[in-house]
From Swiss-Prot:
Its EC number is 3.6.4.12, 1.14.11.6. The gene is JBP2. Residues 555-730 form the Helicase ATP-binding domain. SMART domains: DEXDc, HELICc. This is Bifunctional helicase and thymine dioxygenase JBP2. The lineage of its organism: Eukaryota, Discoba, Euglenozoa, Kinetoplastea, Metakinetoplastina.
Length: 1098
């Protein structure tokens, strides 16, 4: 007995009947009897086999096969089928045989199917089509004759589509005999009983560690609101949240002061501007507005009405003393602010003054509207970009302003405004007072602007500015001014996620005590100011908070006809974000086309993700991918699209996933191709100068350009500038390339070790971050398990040192050599690898560990070797053939360290990936580990997508497969190897993002264990790679992580082997340091934490 339920024994006769239904696809009618069993027995066994049961005919039950489609799939098919003509219906029926049915395969895993699931689906579609168009009299009689009308979801789908088609629900006619009451109750009670039993079974399974909550949910029984989103994707609110929210008045930081002592300006040296004027930055390329002066721009009565409600916001509780000679001035913040550095629950919200005075603030709306109109007329490009960037939730009175700084009797010292949107302008106006002087002076322009009540100044708040002296200050003077602007912190990923959680809570409150039965849900539906964002209901709970936030960020930009960059750390699920966006766009515009451009190796990853999430409702009628696995099917899909473009068939939306090499040919074939959205995966490729790919994409008329990249900045800051400029062409018109390069140079100077450039680097860093925030969604952090990342400096054997000296691998020589022909890399792998590479006999050596007869060309290369070298090469082969593996391994520090790491991982029954850039190194590693009887698999750049897919599956499922050896630059993209929690970078590339991509194969979503990364660095060539990497990482942190960083100096790196907190790992480092190579050199010289190679400055 379990919760009042008992296991009912099943008769052999009932089992035979159910076997026939399950294997043949035919229906069967049964009646309760001693040989069959009672209703409970029939219902229990039918449910166990996932078959369906209907309460007809009278006194009996009809058993039907399991429906081989998800509810939303079936609904979509029925919708299309009932609306199609006879020719289109025939095509749809034929297409049913070309698709896969994962639900059917699962339900038949213990049975041999004697029918095709397409036959059953075709019957359902035909019935639904007839039902939708049938006369009422026929519909009523169908209740007695069709079991389809007694099982979900077919009965709900038929009823819904008939209601849509005819506009009236099905009702009993007086002229027709009603459905017998006893039969109606009989059928309904069966459905209710089965539903209740199913829910009870789910509860039991859950309590006993059965299927997960999301697996148990189905639209058959509806989705409970509590299960619609992940728990951490919904805002937590205390009952007394309104009263307990922290008062952070005065905690706002809006100034950047440039000196320790306040600098006050006088009118001396400045030209006083009293007439309407526009000023441009002529130092840049083209004309970029930096200031617009409008005397009398706002009526005085409008100003004074606003002053009456805004002036009380200005108090002495603030952090602006440095711009007021050391004493707090009267100032305050109205509207919204981003309290990102405060330890508060709500980071992005209205200020305390605003929260308590929203009703009164309506009196300032005419002022804000007036300033907004002037802004749009006189600086239209800045205004447009600010309109695109501002989240609708933070718009004050529908303007492009999120925040107002109110100053009362405040003569500011020289400063710049911190946190303002740099693609926009600040709008300053004096709204009350009686005074003389106190002009606003901008040092760079050498202009001072006379500001009286009603005067307006639009200006670049990143320029140093301050007020001149007050005339006759001994006489009582009053002056109230406001600066209206957009706070960029409100567009941060923190604020986006916070806002998303708030919206999710509102949605759940609206759905309280109901079930979500629709196949899709508009997750923006709780806020009418937001564009719709439709997500499959079953998918919503699989979207992490950061993914939901990214989606919200994207659709707000696309609604305003702007693109954006989605910069998320590798492994956070950018592909799912993009596919969900495609679903929403096609839901709203079913005939639109979408282009996804991605590197060829990643196309199969997109297909796999589409198939994976299709099981959760993410379906696309036409998903055309050129993955090379089925070129015939790809061509057929293109021909189908061609017929639609030529109006030979009705148009339906397509998603094209193609690689850059095929793009030109695709566009030649479809000259009128105009996608609604263009998504570029690994989008940093469009940032390269003179890129032909970018030229091809620019020929497409598409404003909605979405760039996906975990590494939007690869080598220098100018890449990011070109990237943002590509998704929104207007950006370069407000920040000329020359000005951006000046900022980037300031950062580079500090990154490369000039501590004297720190201040300029901070200023440049903040400017670039504020400039890009409206167009770049950044989430560089994650909630994954811990990552332990180490630099292991490996020693060299005596043979390696000998060849290093022969090659002249000193530091100065290495700089000139630049790894010519990769010889230093082969030498650091193993002397055998180096000698074989030189002699061109390597392929034979690694294949059979024997030396073959050399060709004439090879003999010429062998002439580079001395006789001792040839003897050594043969000796190394003999070591392996004689199974003297330790002697062979001890000839290389990196190989010795790698082997010991592998054996440690194997002993822990864990898995490891080894990444290497070079084929020779990959092969030698594979052969060495195989000789040690470590089960190893290798995936090279030349391997097919199918082999890579099989490797992923084998690595995940085969417990004996311990090590994967992968090509860094090819296999590092589009693969998920979270079965491994150890990663070895056997060699490193000049671009650190290549290594980061490799690590992300294991350190990504779905990883449940801490991940350890071992970066093997030789004492020769890899030092220079490391220096290049750390410079670029420091730059990356400055720009995207908002951390002012620089390369660590050699004497700043501290060996962490002795103070390693993990005892087992500490002992392992000690063992490696005691291990000797050939020639009595230590295998491991130093251990450093990789993150310490870049130093962050406070």
């Amino acid at each position: 007995m379990l919760n009042g339920l008992t296991r009912v024994s099943t008769s052999s006769e009932l089992e035979s009947i159910l076997d026939i239904v399950q294997s043949s696809g035919e229906i069967a009618v049964v009646f309760t009897s001693p040989s069959i069993g009672d209703l409970e027995t029939i219902a229990s066994e039918t449910q166990r086999r996932q078959l369906r049961i209907a309460g007809i005919p009278r006194g009996g039950y009809t058993i039907l096969p399991a429906i081989p489609l998800y509810d939303d799939e079936l609904l979509q098919m029925c919708e299309r089928y009932t609306a199609a003509n006879e020719y289109e219906k025939a095509e749809m029926r034929n297409s049913l045989y070309m698709r896969e049915y994962p639900l059917f395969a699962y339900s038949m895993r213990h049975q041999r199917a004697l029918f095709h699931p397409a036959d059953y689906v075709s019957r359902i579609l035909q019935f639904c089509s007839y039902y939708v168009q049938a006369p009422d009299a026929d519909v009523l009689s169908l209740q007695d004759r069709s079991p389809f009308l007694h099982i979900s979801p077919i009965k709900e789908i038929c009823t819904q589509l008939r209601l849509i088609a005819r506009g009236t629900p099905v009702a009993a006619s007086d002229s027709e005999s009603p459905v017998p009451e006893q039969l109606r109750l009989h059928a309904e009670s069966d459905v209710e009983k089965l539903a209740a039993e199913r829910a009870t079974a789910m509860s039991i399974a859950a309590s006993s560690g059965g299927a997960s909550e999301t697996e148990q949910l189905s639209l058959f029984s509806g989705v409970a609101p509590s299960a619609l989103f992940q728990k951490d994707a919904v805002e937590e609110v205390n009952k007394d949240a309104e009263d307990t929210m922290e008062d952070l008045t005065g905690e706002e930081t809006v100034d950047a002061v440039h000196s320790f002592q306040a600098e006050y300006l006088t009118l001396d040296g400045f030209e006083l501007v009293t007439k309407a004027s526009i000023f441009y930055d002529r130092e840049g390329e083209g004309q970029c507005i930096v200031a617009v002066y409008i005397p009398g721009g706002v009526p005085e009565d409008t100003c004074r009405a606003a002053a009456a409600v805004l002036e009380p916001a200005a108090t002495k509780k603030n952090l602006r003393a440095p711009t007021n000679g050391g004493l707090p001035p009267d100032t305050g913040i109205v509207g919204y602010y981003d309290y990102l550095t405060n330890p508060t629950q709500h980071k992005c919200r209205e200020t305390e003054f605003s929260r308590r005075n929203w009703g009164l603030l309506a009196q300032s709306e005419p002022l804000l509207k007036h300033l907004d109109k002037l802004y749009s007329q006189l600086a239209p490009m800045h205004h447009h970009l600010q309109r695109v960037a501002i989240p609708s939730q933070y718009q004050l009175c529908g303007t492009v302003f999120s925040t107002i700084t109110v100053n009362r009797n405040f003569r500011t010292a020289v400063h710049t405004d911190r946190g303002d949107f740099r693609s926009g302008l600040g709008v300053l106006s004096v709204i009350n007072g009686e005074f003389e002087g106190c002009h606003l002076a901008i040092k760079r322009l050498k202009k001072a602007f006379q500001l009286k009540v009603g005067d307006v100044l639009l200006f670049d708040t990143s320029l140093e500015h301050g007020n001149t002296e007050v005339v006759n200050p001994e006489i009582h003077w009053q002056r109230t001014s406001v600066v209206c602007y957009l706070r960029t912190g409100l567009m941060s990923s923190v604020c986006e996620m916070e806002r998303r959680k708030h919206l999710n809570r509102l949605i759940l409150e609206q759905l309280l005590n109901t079930e979500v039965r629709n196949t899709t849900v508009n997750i923006n539906g709780a806020d009418s100011s937001l564009p719709p964002l439709f997500v499959p209901t079953r998918l919503a709970s699989h979207l992490a908070p950061v993914q939901l936030a990214a989606l919200g960020f994207i659709v707000e930009r696309t609604e305003k006809q702007s693109g954006c960059v989605v910069a998320m750390t590798m492994g956070l699920g950018k592909t799912l974000v993009a596919l969900t966006l495609c679903f929403s766009q096609l839901y709203l515009a079913p005939q639109a086309d979408i282009l996804i451009l991605t590197p060829k190796p990643i196309i199969s990853h997109w297909v796999d993700e589409k198939n994976k999430w299709g099981m959760h409702g993410l379906h696309f009628p036409h998903f055309v991918a050129s993955d090379g696995l089925n070129s015939l099917e790809f061509e057929q899909q293109l021909l189908e699209y061609e017929r639609q473009k030529n109006n030979e068939k009705p148009k339906s939306g397509h998603i094209f996933v193609i690689n850059g090499e095929y793009l030109a040919g695709f566009l030649r074939r479809f000259k009128r191709f105009t996608p609604l959205v263009m998504i570029v995966d690994e989008g940093h490729r469009v940032a390269a100068k003179g890129n032909k790919l970018t030229e091809s994409l620019d020929r497409l008329r598409c404003n909605l350009r979405i760039v996906l990249s975990g590494t939007p900045l690869q080598n220098d800051a100018s890449e990011l500038y070109r990237l943002v400029g590509w998704v929104n062409k207007g950006v370069s018109r407000v920040l000329p390339p020359k000005r951006f390069q000046e900022l980037a140079n300031d950062i580079n100077q500090f990154v490369e070790g000039d501590d004297g450039a720190f201040y300029n680097a901070v200023v440049a860093q903040e400017y670039i971050q504020d400039w890009m925030r409206g167009f770049v969604f950044r989430e560089m952090e994650n909630d994954l398990p811990p990552l332990h990342d180490y630099l292991l400096i490996c020693g060299s054997s005596d043979v390696q040192r000998e060849y290093e000296e022969k090659l002249g691998l000193t530091e100065t020589a290495m700089t000139a050599l630049k790894a010519t022909e990769h010889r230093p890399h082969h030498l650091s792998t193993h002397p055998a690898c180096y000698l074989a590479f030189i002699s061109d006999s390597y392929q034979s050596m690694v294949s059979g560990w024997t030396v073959r007869a050399l060709s004439n060309t090879s003999r010429q290369r062998v002439s580079q070797l001395e006789e001792i070298d040839t003897m050594r090469l043969e000796q190394y082969v003999q070591l392996v053939e004689n199974e003297q593996l330790d002697a062979f391994i001890d000839l290389s520090g990196k190989m010795r360290v790698l082997v010991d790491i592998v054996l440690r991982v194997q002993a822990r029954k864990e898995k490891l990936i080894v990444f290497s850039l070079y084929v020779g190194s990959q092969d030698l590693i594979h052969r060495t580990l195989t000789a040690l009887r470590v089960c190893t698999f290798t995936v090279r750049g030349r391997d097919s997508q199918d082999r890579r897919r099989r490797a992923m599956q084998e690595f995940s499922e085969n417990k004996d497969l311990i090590v994967l050896v992968l090509s860094t630059k090819i296999a590092a993209y589009g693969l998920d190897f979270t079965a491994a929690n150890h990663v070895v970078l056997f060699d490193s590339w000049w671009n650190p993002q290549v290594d980061a991509q490799a690590i992300a194969r294991a350190y990504r979503r779905n990883q449940r264990k801490p991940v350890t990364v071992y970066r093997l660095i030789s004492a020769t060539e890899n030092k220079f790679v490391l220096r290049s990497q750390t410079r670029k990482i420091a730059l990356f942190k400055c720009i995207l992580h908002e951390r002012t960083s620089r390369q660590a100096l050699p004497d700043e790196l501290e060996d962490c082997a002795a103070n390693e907190k993990d005892e087992e790992r500490r002992n392992f480092w000690a063992k490696l340091k005691m291990t000797s190579l050939a020639g009595d050199t230590r295998a491991l010289l130093n251990v450093y934490r990789y993150q310490e190679s870049v130093r962050e400055s406070e």
